[in-house]
Each structure stands twice: as structure tokens, then as C-alpha cells.
Amino acid sequence: MLWQRLAVVEWAALAWELLGASVLLIAVRWLVRRLENLSRDPNRCGTLSSLPGASAAVSAQPGEVMTMDAMLARLKLLNPDDLRQEVMKAGLKCGPITSTTRFIFEKKLAQALLEQGGLLTSSLPKHSEVTGTAFIHGTSRTPAFVDRKQTQQACLSEDRDFGYSVGLNPPEEEAVTSSVHPIPFSASTRNDNHKAGVTTAKEPLLYYGVCPVYEDGLVRHERIHVYEDKKEALQAVKLIKGSRFKAFPTREDAEKFARGICDYLPSPSKNMSLLSPVKAMPLCSNDGPKADGLCLAESETVNKERANSYKNPRTQDLTAKLRKAVERGEEHTFSDLIWSNPRYLIGSGDNPTIVQEGCRYNVMHVAAKENQASVCQLTLETLENPEFMRLMYPDDNMDMLQKRILYIVDLYLNTPDKVGFDTPLHFACKFGNVDVVNVLSSHPLIVKNPRNKYGKTPEDVICERSKNKSVELRERIREYLMGHYYVPLLRAEDTSPVIGELWSSDQKAEASSADHCRSSPRDPVMTLRAFVGPLSPSKAEDFRKLWKTPPRKKAGLFHSIRKSDPERGIERVGRELAHELGYPWVEYWEFLGCFVDLSSQEGLQRLEEYLIQKELNQKAQHEIGEEEGCLQDRTSDFGSGKKYSNSISVGAFLDGGDDISLEEVKNQQNTVPSQSQPSVDKFQNSKSGSPSLGQKADPGEAAVGFYPDNSRNGFCYPLNSRTADGRETEATNGEEALPPPVSILTQEFDKLNLQSLGDNLFETPNKNRELEDKILASSKGVVESGLASPAAIARLENKQVRTNSEVSEAMAEMSLGPNSPQLGVQAGLEPGFSSATADPTKRLFLSGEEPSKLDRDVLAALECAIIDPGLYPAVHRWKSTVMGYSPSDRQSWPSPALKGKFTTELVDLDCCHSCSGRSSPAGSSPSKPGHTTFSSGLHSPGRYSPAHGRHFQRVACMARLAAL
């Protein structure tokens, strides 16, 4: 038992020793911490009586230079009104002060004050004021601690606002209000366990307006949905599909919102008394900017856009329909989809629609990856069509539509994917798709040197995924990436050619050819006639020098060609050089109305279509000529004698069964003018002047037949002037047969109608199909009345480019032709002489019925072309016909008569359609989208070639202005 008592005593002593050591250790640690605190903050032990001296040692005096951090800390203590005043006093521009913009204005103001030597105005709070306030409220925090806390708040505010200025999610409105109006520092520092005592104000009454869908909001829902309870507003939003709600301080504003009047109204915060003056200013101001120079962007009403009826396509449709059509190159299916719903291409915020999630590919990524150059071209053409963008935004003006077009096209061309940051140009170069590279690199908005995730440009990844591509293809891709340059040939009205400077669609500075721009009204108007390209810059410059100064071996030949053929000699030289070097070449042909290389497959197809159309016109002319004889007989029979002529005129002027005397009939007949021999001037002025009076019929010589059974008025006229034995009746007493007055009036109206049709030739020269139908129908009517000769009608049916003088000659021929009802007999020509004997197998030429220099020029352009009779039968027949003439005869062929000035391509080449069938940006209709075909041949003029240069230079200029 003794040993047990000893053990208890020992354990008790040991416990007391441990307890004493612990207390001593705690005391030592407390003293050490106390000493550390005193050494860190020697001013902590100061009293309230020593406040002025202590604060004077820390606070900055007026005129004292401060650091950037201290300046920012002091500016953080200002309320928005004081901060705005300081910014304005510093000579800086100030806008709305929010949680996002406050740090920007504070930083600008601090920099401005530091540059001015740190001179602070009296409105800025001193450190002494802050310190005094803190000690009055019994806080233990020092000005240095306040500076640290304010600096930390500034850093937190900067971190919180990061990204909002570059388009990321904005902060909540409650956060905006709380940061703009911070709680006073004195109210947040209490010595009751260092807890902030903040008194919240009572929330004002809010009204929640619920706005239904814009189109049918006032139809389906007659009542105006305004609620005072937020739960009721949320319940109404659930019941009304597609609606939205917003809180307002007044009932009137909520009712406006519920009616669909979406003017900008700031959402009320929980404490309306602390709203910033920028937010509380009037919404509209007729006086312009305020006196303090604030920007009133937020006070302006938001542009009301009418919502379109297109819904976002389902993910299944984007994958199974749109993406599959792009991958397979189904242009018609792709075009039908995007025109039926433009949201297949344009997503929310005018961003490209994503067709493959994960990698976030759009249509251009997929098309570039699958080598679908035609889909890439069709996508760009559709997006650049204002009518397509108008489907999404029907109320936008043209300027806004163009800005939207530039924005969406730039995104489609230069948006990287999510995985490797590869643009469509990266994909095209990576897989060696040279046609896609050609389409993309030729656009003026393309960025040719973007870097992907691994820091590589498109040039660095050429054929990275296709190792079996040839070296020539790799070089072509590199040349396309260098730029698309063209060597243009320009001509003035006097046909003097000029080889212009290099042209490119993405030129950044001066115009393409500054040497031929008109600096004076006396300078000739230069128009584009041919060009070579696209080429790399070095090749384009070398070809330009070679074209201007041919090689010594061929200098004599080329010089003789240029001198002997001033109209198209330099084109022949450039064509031969381009074909020899394998460069793309196109020239303008007036009879086709487009730029094309006739030796290419595309040029042969265009020529084949033109010749087939011309053969059809000649065949129709021949059929009209065969029927002209009987039609002329009918007209001449009406005017074969004065007896029947008078009968016709009398019957024409008798309307009903009213009683009329014979003398009145004779007087009316004498007042009808007969057609005299017209002239070209009288015919051209027939719209304003009346026809001249001709010979009057002698009523005394007219023997009017009376047939009471065949005529209501007692007068009749025979329907056929032939006798029983088939012979034609002759003129009475050997006098000339005069046409009936009714026929004369009909002919005058036919002439006026035909002249109006001829005038339309100059208004719409490119609408050949519609105009042909009108002219052909009118021409048949004129031939039936015996007014025009078939040769004159054929000239109007022809699809060639017409001049004013040519149409005037055609009109004169129609009125003075040998088949005219009056002049045909005077000239002694028999009816149907001109075209009744026309040969249906008449030889075919490009201009008119006789060979001309145009046939020789086209033959020279086809010198190196291989013409397949099975594919191009009309071209083969035409070439055989032309080759049937000897070279000396072909040299003597005259040039086509062009007595007037051209009214087509010489005015503006931007309106000409490309020979590849691509329409202009505004060439399609939303109801009938044009299905274009892309030609990847070297001899096809690109969409971004000099033929469309003015349009795409304007596009590039607008893009550069928008980037500024």
C-alpha cells in the first residue's frame, strides 16, 4: 500500500510541474506577440489627444507627391459624384460610373494627378480624416490598414471586372449598385467584436411587367400583365410561352414594357435613393450632350428590331441535314436549307452557327476540311447578299446590313476551332485542298497568317495531313497565300490600250492603278478589257514586264500584231504569252457580255450556247418569212382598189345601227389621213407629232356596194379580194392602190409600239430572255400587219450588244422596208420577195449575216483549243464555215459597225456577271435563290477579280474603317 501512496504523490507533483510550465510558456508567447505587435505598429498606443500629430505624420499634405497605390486608395473613398467631379476637373472625359468603369476612371485620374505633380484638390479625403473617423468610432484599425484594405478592394474589383470589357458576362445589377455606392467606412467599423453594423433601408414597391412574344403579344393576350408580387410575375412567365419580365419603379414603365415598348429603362436597385446621377438622368434629351460633357449612350433608346419568324434549327437538323450536305458537296440542298431558314448560318449575336459540337466547327470549317470549294464559295456569296441578311433583320437600313455582313463574313473566315485553334484556312492548307485555299485566300477579309494552338501559320502546315501531295500543288498553295494579284489591260474610248499596275482585292492603301485614274475631266475614261491572274506578286510583276516588253525572239511578231490590229492586238499578245506560261487569262467579249477565255471548256460552252441561240433565231426568222407571203396578200387585198378601200373605211367609222347619211360618211372618210412615204426623222418623231396628210380618196369615184343582208348599216366589204379564179384584183384605172385608212392607223400604232420596244433595249441590256419574248411577239404582230421586213425583225431578235444608232437603223428599215404596205408596191417588189426565198441552211456568223472581223478574232482565240464535234457541234460548224474562207479573205473582213457608244460594260464592269455563272452579292432573291456553280479551272475569272474590283475594294475599305 505504501508504494501506491508514493506513486500518487509523484504523479500529483508531476502534474503541477507540467501545469506551471504550460502557464509559463503561454505567458512567454503572449509577451512575445505583444512585443511584435508593438514593434509593427508603434502608433497603436497613441491616444486621441495625439491624433493631429500622428495623422500629420502619415497623411499627405497638399502639394505632396504620392505613390500610385496611395492615390488609388484615396480615390476609392470617393463616392461617384465626387469622383466624376474630380475627373472633369482634371480635364478628362467621363462617362457612366459603374462597377466596371469605376476602376478605369480612378486609374486615369490617378495617372493624370501624378503627371501634374501629385497636387490634390481639397475635395479628396485626407488620411487624417479617415484616421480621425476611425478613432472616434473606437476602432483599432490604422490608416495603413485602411490603405491595405482599399488596395485589396481595388485588386478584387479589378479581378472581378476582368473580361467584362472584352465581351464576357456582365456583373449583376445588385453588384453594380453596391459597388457604385459603397457603404461608408465609418459605418462598417465598430469595436463590438469588430462586426459591421449596417442598417438596410426599406425596399420600395416594385412593379413587374411581363412582355409576351412581340408579334402576337397584343392579339393573344389582351390584358396587360403588371404585378406587384414577383412570384405572380414568375407564374405568368411560365404560363405565357416565350415571355419575359422586368422590374420597374413605376407602374407606367412596367405597362410600357408589357406592351412591347422596349425602351431602355434601368432596373431598380434595392436602394433607389443611392442611384447614380448617370442612371437617374432623363432618358431623352433634346439639347444634345449635357453641360458636363457626359456621354448619353445609355440614355438613348435602343433600336427596336422586329423579331423574325425563324426558329433555331434543331441539333439533329444541323447534323443530319446541313453538315451532311456540306460534306457531300450538295449545293442545291445546302442552298435550300439556308434560304428556308437563315439561322442555319446566322446564330445568336450574329455568330456562325455551330454544326459540330465539341470542336465547335461551323460550315466553313467542315467545307474546308472536306475540300468542298463550291460550298465555301456559295456560303460567302450568300452571306454577302443583303437580301439574305434582310431575312434576319427586315427593318435594318442598308448601312447596318453591310456592317452585319462584314461582321459575320469575318467570323466565318477567321474563327478558330475550340481544339487546335485552327481557322478554315488552316484546315484547307493542312489537307492540301488547293481549291479551297484559292477561294479563302482571295477574299479581302481573310487573315492569312493566324497562329493556331501550336504557334503555326497556315503556311507552316501545308499538306501536314496529306503527305502524298505533289510539289507543284504545295507551291500553288504557297502562291495563293502570298496574295492574288492581277495584271489588267485597260482601254479608253479611242481604243488606246494601257497595261495597268498590279491589282489585288486585299490592297490596303492606294488604288490599284493610280496612273490611269482620272485627275482631269479631259483624261479618257479607262475601262477593263482583259486581265491575267491570279498570280503571286513576283510572277505578276514579271508577266507585266514581259507583256509590255516582249522577248527579243518574238518582238517583231508581237509588234506587227499590235500595229495591224489596234482593236484587239495587245489582247492577242497577252493571250499568247499567258497560254505559253500557263497563266490564267480572260478577256471581255461584247457579244457574250462577260469575261471569259474562249479556249477553255467554259468559254467553249458559252460560245456553243450563243451559236445555238442564234441558229434558233434564224430558224424562227425563216418560218416567219414563209408565212409572210399570205400575210402580205391579206394586207394588199385590203388595199387593192379604191372601191374596197372606201368600203373598209366607211364600215370602220360606223358603230351601231344609227341612221347616218352618205354625205356624212364621205366627210368622215375624207378626214382620215393616208400614209405618205415616211422618213426616218418622221418615224422617230411619231410619238409627238401626228402623221402627215396624204392623198385623199375621191368619194365621187367610189362605188359603194349595198348589201342589206350582209351588213347592219347597209354597207359591206369583202373579206377576200381575190376573184373566183384566184387572181388578185387590180387597181382601178391603173392608179396606185392605196392602203385602207384603218390599216394606216393600225400601222401607226404598231410603229409606236415597236419603237417603245426598241427603246427598252438600252434600259436593260442584260435581260435578254424577257426582252426577246416581247420583241418576238411584237415582231410577229408587225409582220402580220405587213409593217416590217424579217431582216429587221431578226436584228431586234439578236442578242448582241446594240447601240443607239443600230436600233435607229432597224426602226428605219421596218418603216422603209420593201415589204411595207405602201412602199412595196411603189418599189415594184413582189410580195414575200425578201424572206420567202430565204435559205434555211444559211451560213452562221457571229455578227449579222456576213462574216466580220469578230469571226476572225474569235477564230484566233480558238487557235489552240481542241473542239469536240460531239460536245460543241455549233462551234464546230461555225469554225468549219469560217475556215472555208482563205486567209486573205479573212483579213479583208470589216469590223462590226459600232456607230454609237457602248452602253454596257464600258460604263461599269461591276454589273457584269462572271462567266462562271456566279451572281453578284445581290443577284439572288430570297424566294428564288440562285444555285451557282463553282469552277475551279485556271481560266475562270474569280469572284474577287478585277471584274468585281470596285465592289470588293469597297468591302475591304468598310472593313478597315470598322476596325478603326
Curated annotation (Swiss-Prot):
<feature type="compositionally biased region" description="Low complexity">
    <location>
        <begin position="919"/>
        <end position="930"/>
    </location>
</feature>
<keyword id="KW-0812">Transmembrane</keyword>
<feature type="modified residue" description="Phosphoserine">
    <location>
        <position position="520"/>
    </location>
</feature>
<dbReference type="GO" id="GO:0051721">
    <property type="term" value="F:protein phosphatase 2A binding"/>
</dbReference>
<dbReference type="InterPro" id="IPR003887">
    <property type="entry name" value="LEM_dom"/>
</dbReference>
<comment type="subunit">
    <text>Interacts with BAF/BANF1. Interacts with protein phosphatase 2A (PP2A) components PPP2C (PPP2CA or PPP2CB) and PPP2R1A.</text>
</comment>
<keyword id="KW-0040">ANK repeat</keyword>
<keyword id="KW-0256">Endoplasmic reticulum</keyword>
<feature type="modified residue" description="Phosphoserine">
    <location>
        <position position="940"/>
    </location>
</feature>
<dbReference type="InterPro" id="IPR056237">
    <property type="entry name" value="ANKLE2_3rd"/>
</dbReference>
<keyword id="KW-0735">Signal-anchor</keyword>
<feature type="domain" description="LEM">
    <location>
        <begin position="72"/>
        <end position="116"/>
    </location>
</feature>
<feature type="transmembrane region" description="Helical; Signal-anchor for type III membrane protein">
    <location>
        <begin position="8"/>
        <end position="28"/>
    </location>
</feature>
<dbReference type="GO" id="GO:0005783">
    <property type="term" value="C:endoplasmic reticulum"/>
</dbReference>
<feature type="modified residue" description="Phosphoserine">
    <location>
        <position position="676"/>
    </location>
</feature>
<dbReference type="GO" id="GO:0007084">
    <property type="term" value="P:mitotic nuclear membrane reassembly"/>
</dbReference>
<protein>
    <recommendedName>
        <fullName>Ankyrin repeat and LEM domain-containing protein 2</fullName>
    </recommendedName>
</protein>
<dbReference type="GO" id="GO:0004860">
    <property type="term" value="F:protein kinase inhibitor activity"/>
</dbReference>
<comment type="similarity">
    <text>Belongs to the ANKLE2 family.</text>
</comment>
<feature type="region of interest" description="Disordered">
    <location>
        <begin position="667"/>
        <end position="705"/>
    </location>
</feature>
<keyword id="KW-1133">Transmembrane helix</keyword>
<dbReference type="InterPro" id="IPR002110">
    <property type="entry name" value="Ankyrin_rpt"/>
</dbReference>
<dbReference type="Pfam" id="PF24567">
    <property type="entry name" value="ANKLE2_3rd"/>
</dbReference>
<dbReference type="InterPro" id="IPR036770">
    <property type="entry name" value="Ankyrin_rpt-contain_sf"/>
</dbReference>
<feature type="modified residue" description="Phosphoserine">
    <location>
        <position position="267"/>
    </location>
</feature>
<feature type="compositionally biased region" description="Polar residues">
    <location>
        <begin position="667"/>
        <end position="693"/>
    </location>
</feature>
<feature type="modified residue" description="Phosphoserine">
    <location>
        <position position="536"/>
    </location>
</feature>
<dbReference type="Pfam" id="PF03020">
    <property type="entry name" value="LEM"/>
</dbReference>
<dbReference type="GO" id="GO:0005789">
    <property type="term" value="C:endoplasmic reticulum membrane"/>
</dbReference>
<feature type="modified residue" description="Phosphoserine">
    <location>
        <position position="276"/>
    </location>
</feature>
<dbReference type="GO" id="GO:0007417">
    <property type="term" value="P:central nervous system development"/>
</dbReference>
<comment type="function">
    <text>Involved in mitotic nuclear envelope reassembly by promoting dephosphorylation of BAF/BANF1 during mitotic exit. Coordinates the control of BAF/BANF1 dephosphorylation by inhibiting VRK1 kinase and promoting dephosphorylation of BAF/BANF1 by protein phosphatase 2A (PP2A), thereby facilitating nuclear envelope assembly. May regulate nuclear localization of VRK1 in non-dividing cells. It is unclear whether it acts as a real PP2A regulatory subunit or whether it is involved in recruitment of the PP2A complex. Involved in brain development.</text>
</comment>
<feature type="modified residue" description="Phosphoserine">
    <location>
        <position position="504"/>
    </location>
</feature>
<feature type="repeat" description="ANK">
    <location>
        <begin position="420"/>
        <end position="449"/>
    </location>
</feature>
<feature type="modified residue" description="Phosphoserine">
    <location>
        <position position="916"/>
    </location>
</feature>
<dbReference type="Pfam" id="PF00023">
    <property type="entry name" value="Ank"/>
</dbReference>
<dbReference type="GO" id="GO:0043066">
    <property type="term" value="P:negative regulation of apoptotic process"/>
</dbReference>
<keyword id="KW-0498">Mitosis</keyword>
<keyword id="KW-0131">Cell cycle</keyword>
<dbReference type="InterPro" id="IPR035006">
    <property type="entry name" value="LEM_ANKL2"/>
</dbReference>
<dbReference type="GO" id="GO:0051301">
    <property type="term" value="P:cell division"/>
</dbReference>
<dbReference type="GO" id="GO:0042326">
    <property type="term" value="P:negative regulation of phosphorylation"/>
</dbReference>
